[in-house]
UniProtKB/Swiss-Prot annotation:
<feature type="disulfide bond">
    <location>
        <begin position="56"/>
        <end position="110"/>
    </location>
</feature>
<feature type="glycosylation site" description="N-linked (GlcNAc...) asparagine">
    <location>
        <position position="80"/>
    </location>
</feature>
<dbReference type="GO" id="GO:0005615">
    <property type="term" value="C:extracellular space"/>
</dbReference>
<dbReference type="GO" id="GO:0016914">
    <property type="term" value="C:follicle-stimulating hormone complex"/>
</dbReference>
<protein>
    <recommendedName>
        <fullName>Glycoprotein hormones alpha chain</fullName>
    </recommendedName>
</protein>
<keyword id="KW-0325">Glycoprotein</keyword>
<dbReference type="InterPro" id="IPR029034">
    <property type="entry name" value="Cystine-knot_cytokine"/>
</dbReference>
<dbReference type="InterPro" id="IPR000476">
    <property type="entry name" value="Glyco_hormone"/>
</dbReference>
<feature type="glycosylation site" description="N-linked (GlcNAc...) asparagine">
    <location>
        <position position="106"/>
    </location>
</feature>
<keyword id="KW-0732">Signal</keyword>
<feature type="disulfide bond">
    <location>
        <begin position="38"/>
        <end position="88"/>
    </location>
</feature>
<comment type="function">
    <text>Shared alpha chain of the active heterodimeric glycoprotein hormones thyrotropin/thyroid stimulating hormone/TSH, lutropin/luteinizing hormone/LH and follitropin/follicle stimulating hormone/FSH. These hormones bind specific receptors on target cells that in turn activate downstream signaling pathways.</text>
</comment>
<dbReference type="GO" id="GO:0010469">
    <property type="term" value="P:regulation of signaling receptor activity"/>
</dbReference>
<feature type="disulfide bond">
    <location>
        <begin position="60"/>
        <end position="112"/>
    </location>
</feature>
<dbReference type="GO" id="GO:0007186">
    <property type="term" value="P:G protein-coupled receptor signaling pathway"/>
</dbReference>
<comment type="similarity">
    <text>Belongs to the glycoprotein hormones subunit alpha family.</text>
</comment>
<dbReference type="GO" id="GO:0016913">
    <property type="term" value="F:follicle-stimulating hormone activity"/>
</dbReference>
């Protein structure tokens, strides 16, 4: 009888440790983000006006890393973390005029490039 209690205790302890480790990770740590690659996508709002309008949408490269000490010395406000990012932007486009006065850029080709507009 003591033999079975020892095995049950070991199994419960192992299960407890496993559950503790599982719950210590933030939600979504093991899942990939649901973000499509950078490509052309039809704009539903402006395409209703008769001409199909496309825009570049999707995800590109982004990362953060510790700022090298050499770079920190040249900064006006030293930062511990440096980040790099690229955004999905139009490589080529055609200017289109809708309804006589609405001017749009109809994207024809997309690629990942330097982000110019981060936050407004």
């Amino acid at each position: 009888m003591d033999y079975y209690r020892k095995h049950a205790a070991v199994i419960l302890a192992t299960l407890s440790v496993f559950l503790h480790i599982l719950h210590s990770f933030p939600d979504g740590e093991f899942t990939t983000q649901d973000c499509p690659e950078c490509k052309l996508k039809k704009n539903k709002y402006f395409s209703k006006l008769g001409v199909p309008i496309y825009q570049c949408m999707g995800c590109c490269f982004s990362r953060a890393y510790p700022t090298p000490a050499r770079s920190k010395k040249t900064m006006l406000v030293p930062k511990n973390i440096t980040s790099e990012a690229t955004c999905c932007v139009a490589k080529a486009f055609i200017r289109v005029t809708l309804m006589g006065n609405i001017r749009l850029e109809n994207h024809t080709q997309c690629y990942c490039s330097t982000c110019y507009h981060h936050k407004i």
